[in-house]
């Protein structure tokens, strides 16, 4: 039996950040207002949606995770715009001969209500990946007041990416 590289690859990503005062709340590149004035804590802009998508893209090609490329110990990534980091991850994927078929993600947060911002998130992510907005799925759900997301201690995101050999 001969070995061949499949023409499709799938990757999973996950990220979570703590909600804290005096930080911006950025999701999918959009600056949002939390009713309690909270934002996500992190070395970069802490955009859990974009971080989960980056990890899914990297995972599809067994390239590690975003911490390998943008370590929080490196001062150059302090306050970094995650959409700019996403462009770098996509360039890495393309340099290895792969293209993005689609990405799909689910945000888990009690507040703020995310539905009014979903289309803007999808468009911003699609632009940075270089795909049409209908190739970027973003959904939001609550955790029914269970766990850290339910207690509004943080926001998390799960993502999946499908890649195709170019």
UniProtKB/Swiss-Prot annotation:
Q: What is its EC number?
A: 4.6.1.12
Q: Name one GO biological process term.
A: terpenoid biosynthetic process
Q: Where does a divalent metal cation bind?
A: 15, 17, 51
Q: Which InterPro entries match?
A: MECDP_synthase, MECDP_synthase_CS, MECDP_synthase_sf
Gene3D superfamilies for the chain: 2-C-methyl-D-erythritol 2,4-cyclodiphosphate synthase
Answer yes or no on keyword Lyase.
yes
Which keywords does this chain's UniProt record carry?
Isoprene biosynthesis, Lyase, Metal-binding
Note on cofactor: Binds 1 divalent metal cation per subunit.
Record pathway: Isoprenoid biosynthesis; isopentenyl diphosphate biosynthesis via DXP pathway; isopentenyl diphosphate from 1-deoxy-D-xylulose 5-phosphate: step 4/6
Superkingdom: Bacteria
Residue(s) at site: Transition state stabilizer: 43, 142
- A molecular function GO annotation: metal ion binding
Please list the residues that bind 4-CDP-2-C-methyl-D-erythritol 2-phosphate.
Answer: 15-17, 43-44, 65-67, 141-144, 151
What Pfam family does this protein match (any one)?
A: YgbB
Q: Which reaction does it catalyse?
A: 4-CDP-2-C-methyl-D-erythritol 2-phosphate = 2-C-methyl-D-erythritol 2,4-cyclic diphosphate + CMP
What is the documented function of this protein? Involved in the biosynthesis of isopentenyl diphosphate (IPP) and dimethylallyl diphosphate (DMAPP), two major building blocks of isoprenoid compounds. Catalyzes the conversion of 4-diphosphocytidyl-2-C-methyl-D-erythritol 2-phosphate (CDP-ME2P) to 2-C-methyl-D-erythritol 2,4-cyclodiphosphate (ME-CPP) with a corresponding release of cytidine 5-monophosphate (CMP).
Concerning its family, UniProt says: Belongs to the IspF family.
Q: How does it assemble?
A: Homotrimer.
Q: Which NCBIfam families match?
A: ispF (TIGR00151)
Query: What protein name is recorded for this chain?
Result: 2-C-methyl-D-erythritol 2,4-cyclodiphosphate synthase
Question: What gene is behind this protein?
Answer: ispF
């Amino acid at each position: 039996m001969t070995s061949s590289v499949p023409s499709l690859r799938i990757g999973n990503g996950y990220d979570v950040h703590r909600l804290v005062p005096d930080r911006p709340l950025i999701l999918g590149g959009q600056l949002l207002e939390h009713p309690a004035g909270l934002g996500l804590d992190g070395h970069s802009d802490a955009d859990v949606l974009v971080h989960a998508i980056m990890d899914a893209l990297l995972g599809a090609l067994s390239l590690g995770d975003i911490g390998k490329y943008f370590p929080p110990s490196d001062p150059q990534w302090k306050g970094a715009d995650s959409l700019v980091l996403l462009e770098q991850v996509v360039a890495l994927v393309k340099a290895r001969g792969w293209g993005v078929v689609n990405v799909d993600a689910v945000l888990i947060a009690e507040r703020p209500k995310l539905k009014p911002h979903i289309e803007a998130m999808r468009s911003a992510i699609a632009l940075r990946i270089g795909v049409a907005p209908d190739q970027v799925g973003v959904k939001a759900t609550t955790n029914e007041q269970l766990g850290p997301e339910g207690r509004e201690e943080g926001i998390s995101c799960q993502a999946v990416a499908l890649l195709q050999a170019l």
